[in-house]
Amino acid sequence: VNGRRTRKSNADGGYTEYYIIDGLAVAERRYYSGGGVQYTLRYLYDESNNPVGFGMQYPNSTRWTNYYFEKNVQGDVIGVYQKEGDGNSATHILAARYSYDPYGNPTSMTNGAGTAVSQTSNTIAAINPFRYRGYRYDGDTGLYYLQSRYYDPVSCRFVNADKYASTGQGITG
């Protein structure tokens, strides 16, 4: 859809993800493995289209579990909290914690108990795609998607150029 990824599969066919796009943002992600849907995520955004969390639903369940992001002043997602309950009695339980080097390379990823987890684990820390600066992280490639191009934190470079819209006067006009 308009040059946006709507599907992703790994090389051995072990899983497939489908993305539902709403405007510029991914509204929903469905993860399929072993012949069926394993979970569905619905992303939550603020009025400026910045990610603030997601709802998660497992198959054969009508219940959605909500998770909200903790961000530092730079916009890095440094924590994910699971919301339990409603209203004044709601509590927020730490589900994941992240840290990064200055270029966006993940330096640690832990579950709510503080135990290190891998990008391939079936944990909230690995499932959540929003990380450094609030960008979408692709654990298969190690790249961040910045709405129009990909950033590689290892080389500290963008892997593709910005789109160019002609003004009829060249790139300096």
Residue ranges of predicted features:
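A short glycine-rich beta-turn/N-cap micro-motif
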Residues: 1-8, 20-29, 45-54, 71-79, ...
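Gly/Ser-enriched beta-turn/beta-hairpin loop segments
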Residues: 112-113, 119-127
